[in-house]
Amino acid sequence: YGGTCINIGCIPTKTLLVAAEKDLSFEEVIATKNTITGRLNGKNYATVAGTGVDIFDAEAHFLSNKVIEIQAGDEKKELTAETIVINTGAVSNVLPIPGLATSKNIFDSTGIQSLDKLPEKLGILGGGNIGL
């Protein structure tokens, strides 16, 4: 909970930069990033849940302009509301370069944050904290 900034953007990438300057192992750097993002996710979830709203982690589609059907695993449920907030997030655009989408050695800024092991060599296209 918290969107791009907390989960895969500015917070984790800046955490990686600061932790790397402390001469930690790659595993320690990733653990630090995961701890910080996990705490912020928990805080954001608690803040929203504390307001009395219903929170659903599910896939959904509209049945009408005020009715959606949500599905989490095998469970389905219809929900009706005057106002429905669509919080879909986004995904990176993969350029139509042959082999790019299927390569196991090319990562976007989200995928590289999930690695268990530091690559021996790494080339980066992009800039700013997320690119670094």
What are these regions (language model features)?
Residues 1-40:
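Beta1-alpha1 glycine-rich phosphate/pyrophosphate-binding loop at the start
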Residues 132:
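Residues forming the Rossmann-fold NAD(P)(H) cofactor-binding site
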